[in-house]
């Protein structure tokens, strides 16, 4: 594939990466740095089944193109059924973690952390009163794909090693 992926780390260093695979049902992808630095540390994933409503969270992303943005809030609800439509107009339901940390266009794919610095989910979508995604913004109802589902899908993508992957895993 002609897809070129560049990853910029917090220190500003850029690295080429390769797409390992994607999952259309969760809109998740796995990439691999081609020549990662030897001191690069992976994030730790929390057990999303142990999350509690009221727990402090921080969402990281690039909303509206503003790099390295962090917003804070709490877990508002667990196992919230969220329906999104994929590129083929198929409806996909994920039992998401609802958070009130501001999520805006550009945050999707970024991590949501707990107070211990562990990933509890991946920012995915927001509830909005806007009629178009161009005017959508945070009203305090954001959703993250739970970390346990993220881990299962990523492990399956890595095991499958196919660029196009459709998960049959259901969120629990």
Where is each model-derived feature located?
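Serine-dependent protease modules
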Residues: 1-167, 171
């Amino acid at each position: 594939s002609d897809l070129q992926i560049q990853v910029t780390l917090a220190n500003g260093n850029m690295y080429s990466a390769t797409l390992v695979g994607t999952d259309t049902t969760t809109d998740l992808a796995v990439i691999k740095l081609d020549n990662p630095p030897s001191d690069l540390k992976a994030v730790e994933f929390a057990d999303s089944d142990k999350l509690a409503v009221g727990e402090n969270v921080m969402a990281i992303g690039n909303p509206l193109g503003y790099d390295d943005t962090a917003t804070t809030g709490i877990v508002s609800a667990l196992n919230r059924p969220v329906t999104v439509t994929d590129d083929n107009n198929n409806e996909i339901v994920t039992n998401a973690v609802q958070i009130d940390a501001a999520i805006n266009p550009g945050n999707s794919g970024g991590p949501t952390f707990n107070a211990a610095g562990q990933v509890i989910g991946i920012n995915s979508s927001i509830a909005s009163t806007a009629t178009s995604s161009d005017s959508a913004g945070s009203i305090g109802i954001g959703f993250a794909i739970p970390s346990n589902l993220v881990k299962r899908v990523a492990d399956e993508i890595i095991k499958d090693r196919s660029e196009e992957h459709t998960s049959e895993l259901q969120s629990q």
